[in-house]
């Protein structure tokens, strides 16, 4: 390769770096094939899987730490933005990689994307760009819907050699793949043609790019923290097809224990964490690709195939703990953390102090967004609330509501707060299981000798740290109101997401307070043209302000229930269980708010579906 430049020395240096980049390819081309959907030049290897994991993890990092546009990016932006897609970097793509897919194919993919199709598209796209063999399976139900049947059977497969072009393969895969592809028993007909297999809970194999499947919902594992926490990428099923991060171990649930079915001990053992069944390109003596097949279960041992998840759940079900060396973790989540952590110890106080900085930052960013939204409403009028629409809801809408409302980002902020609660809860549990793992630096004055003492100390230190972290917001009359993290924690379920509301309500100013008295009346319009008074709309939105995840069904407003739904306990209450006995309660949302009389037109008593079946 020749480079023309006015600086010959730079050209030589660039050429050297260019060649070194290709030389650093973890899996250089060794195969030859120019037929089918795309050229195939590599086999899947352990190093290739690590390369894929790095690619997926980078997308997650950009979705959480990139610009505002990158954090809300849909699939077209993710794939075409060179900062988000490492495969747009020639050195990462490697020698013999395939070019970017067309914008028309990307539009087609976007239009059909859902949680399951995202888990299909990402490895398919990676295989295409890196010139790897790929295939998908077709499944059919034993009875009922393929997404919800007791189990499915594999009817056949389609490999890249079966398609005439890359666009054909992508489109066929987007049509044929659903969450039903995960519902294949290990011992069923053609089971060794399945797309995925259960994976070992082992840092060598449980990598970004693996999947998690729980009845009708699939996620892409995208990040494992130093402490062994699993973080995921998810895709909405609404028309906007948003891709968002899902930070929570609670999605790893619903796993069937081995032996649950006495007639077939492996029946139902398809939920949980799974690894892709990487295909093999069959080659002749000249290195030409002559076919593609699935790896067998035995061949997949190299990539982490294991049924241990179902054994673990069986032991936990029987004993309420599992023996892990000298330790006895009491939940599958704790076992995952113990096995997947990459640190020798944790320092709860140090973690809390650093995390409070991050938590404050996300609310400081929120303030700028609140002010921009208020300015938009003042200048261009009220924004219609997407009430009871088939194709839209408050989390996924079109136009101005999507741009200026904050229900989705507020879910993320609440989850960021509750992550701290969960992490500290984990630290208290670890103190009993392996006290040497929990370093008490900075907590010496508490003379900690028990889990109860540690939890009390962490609550005290959290309160101190939260009092020391503060920001401010501008009221509608431009007065400045200071808020500490203590204030934000107190108002956690009171922060309005409705862009029609003035900043006082957006920041949860208490009813009857001087802070709230300055809020001007601003109605919230609904699609039929009716305008809902501000205080009434605010109370009817109470349920949505309590959620820990986005909903996919229609959103209500008029006559929406305002109490009787469970609201998660905050950090102090969660840790208090270590030294107090508390009866479980159903918390009334927005208890400070007087509930208005229900609107006469309402018939709203609906079930809110939290997990889409795709």
Task: For the regions a language model picked out, list residue spans one by one.
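Sec/Tat signal peptide C-region and signal peptidase I cleavage site
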Residues: 18-22
């Amino acid at each position: 390769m020749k480079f023309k430049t006015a600086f010959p020395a730079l050209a030589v240096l660039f050429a050297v770096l260019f060649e070194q980049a290709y030389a650093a390819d973890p899996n250089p081309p060794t195969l030859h094939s120019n037929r089918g959907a795309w050229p195939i030049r590599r086999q899947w290897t352990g190093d290739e899987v690590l390369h894929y994991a790095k690619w997926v993890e980078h997308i997650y990092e950009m979705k959480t730490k990139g610009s505002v546009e990158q954090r809300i990016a849909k699939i077209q932006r993710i794939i075409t933005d060179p900062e988000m897609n490492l495969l747009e970097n020639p050195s990462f793509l490697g020698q013999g990689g395939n070019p970017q897919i067309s914008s028309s194919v990307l539009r087609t993919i976007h239009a059909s994307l859902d949680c399951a199709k995202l888990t299909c598209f990402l490895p398919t796209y990676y295989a295409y760009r890196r010139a790897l063999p790929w295939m998908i399976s077709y499944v059919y139900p034993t009875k009922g819907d393929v997404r919800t049947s007791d189990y499915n059977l594999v009817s056949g497969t389609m490999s890249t050699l079966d398609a005439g072009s890359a666009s054909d393969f992508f489109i066929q895969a987007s049509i044929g793949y659903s969450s039903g592809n995960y519902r294949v028993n290990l011992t069923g007909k053609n089971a060794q043609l399945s797309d995925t297999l259960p994976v070992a809970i082992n840092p060598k194999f449980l990598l970004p790019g693996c999947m998690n499947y729980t009845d009708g919902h699939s996620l892409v594992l995208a990040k494992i923290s130093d402490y062994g926490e699993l973080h995921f990428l998810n895709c909405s099923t609404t028309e906007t097809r948003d891709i968002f991060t899902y930070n929570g171990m609670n999605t790893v649930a619903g796993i069937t224990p081995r032996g649950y079915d006495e007639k077939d001990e492996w029946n139902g053992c398809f939920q949980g964490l799974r690894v892709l069944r990487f295909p093999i390109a069959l080659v002749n003596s000249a290195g030409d690709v002559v076919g593609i097949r699935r790896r067998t279960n035995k061949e997949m041992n190299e990539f982490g195939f294991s049924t241990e998840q179902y054994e673990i759940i069986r032991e936990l079900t029987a004993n309420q703990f599992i023996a892990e060396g000298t330790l006895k973790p009491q939940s599958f989540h704790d076992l995952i953390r113990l096995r997947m952590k990459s640190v020798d110890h944790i320092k709860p106080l140090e973690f809390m102090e650093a995390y409070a900085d991050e938590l404050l930052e996300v609310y400081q960013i929120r303030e700028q967004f609140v002010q921009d939204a208020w300015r938009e409403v003042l200048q261009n009028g009220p924004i219609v609330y997407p009430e009871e629409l088939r194709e839209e809801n408050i989390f996924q809408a079109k136009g101005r509501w999507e741009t200026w409302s904050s229900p989705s980002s507020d879910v993320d902020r609440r989850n960021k707060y509750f992550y701290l609660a969960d992490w500290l809860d984990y630290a208290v549990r670890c103190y009993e299981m392996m006290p040497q793992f929990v370093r008490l630096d900075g907590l010496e004055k508490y003379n900690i000798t028990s889990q109860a003492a540690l939890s009390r100390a962490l609550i005290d230190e959290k309160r101190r740290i939260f009092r020391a972290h503060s920001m401010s917001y501008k009221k509608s009359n431009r007065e400045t109101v200071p808020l500490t993290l203590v204030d934000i924690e107190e108002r956690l379920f009171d922060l309005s997401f409705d862009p029609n509301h003035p900043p006082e309500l957006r920041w949860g100013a208490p009813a009857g307070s001087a802070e709230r008295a300055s809020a001007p009346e601003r109605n919230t319009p609904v699609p039929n043209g009716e305008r809902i008074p501000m205080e009434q709309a605010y109370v009817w939105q109470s349920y949505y302000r309590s959620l820990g995840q986005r909903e996919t069904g229609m959103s209500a407003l008029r006559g929406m229930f305002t109490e009787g739904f469970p609201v998660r306990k905050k950090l102090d209450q969660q840790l208090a269980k270590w030294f107090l006995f508390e009866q479980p309660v159903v918390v009334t949302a927005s208890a400070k708010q007087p509930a208005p009389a229900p609107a006469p037109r309402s018939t709203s008593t609906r079930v809110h579906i939290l997990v889409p079946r795709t």
